[in-house]
Amino acid sequence: MQPCNPIGYVHSLESFGSVDGPGVRFVVFLQGCALRCKYCHNPETWAAEGGEEWTVEQLFQRVWRYRNYWGRKGGITVSGGEPLRQMEFLTAFFELARSKGVHTALDTAGQPFRPDDPDYLAGFDRLMKSTSLVILDLKEIDPEKHRQLTGRDNANILAMARHISDLGVPLWIRHVLVPGLTDDEESLRRTADFIRSLKTVQRVEVLPYHTLGLFKWQKLGISYPLPDAVPPTAEQVRRAEELLEVAKYPG
């Protein structure tokens, strides 16, 4: 069934993204996320009711102005928040973009994925048909550690990664490295094993933890759960990249 003029709730727009997929990207940040990651740098996107309302056509008209900057590699990335919370809007937006030949990337943590819901899967599979690339943030491979880190289980997230791979959609995998929290070598080895089981992974990236979003927690009056966390050293990043076999996935 065709979406009936779905409305999207957009947190913000970035016209010249350079780290959100291949080439120069126009990045759309959608509102709403159910995860509560301890290192989240966009906590203002959590609330589903926030953001500015856009129609698919309005948003695409804004994005389309920047097409001359994308070249052959660039395009559109939709991030968040968690964009899969607005899947109807996202699907209509990507379908319009692909009809114009635009490369589309979905930047997601996968939390809304429902592997046991046939109706949801049908909608998800439709979205994947107009998705050129999925950028998946694998936060933690161990279920209990994932719950401690985000407040949610990760079984459905891992199932989503497998499903995307089975559909043949290209994947980039990202992992945020927080010393003392997400740098356990055994967990990183298990993550590498999982990534190796996926057939469509093109790139694996280690993202060093940073504190650039700390002021947002303070502005919102939320206690920051990692007051003593520090960014990883270059050697810690190198070791994580080695364990995750980053060199095998040049992208």
Task: Indicate where each model-derived feature is located.
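Auxiliary Fe-S-binding modules of radical SAM enzymes
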Residues: 1-19, 172, 177-251
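Short cysteine/histidine-rich metal-coordination sites, predominantly Zn2+-binding motifs
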Residues: 51-61
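Short glycine-enriched, charge-decorated loop/helix-capping segments at active-site entrances
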Residues: 44-48, 147-153, 221-229
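Short glycine-rich or small-residue beta-strand-to-loop segments that form or flank ligand, phosphate
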Residues: 77-79
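Short, conserved loop/turn and helix-capping segments at secondary-structure boundaries
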Residues: 53, 151-154, 231-234
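N-terminal [4Fe-4S]-dependent radical SAM core
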Residues: 1-30, 35-52, 65-72
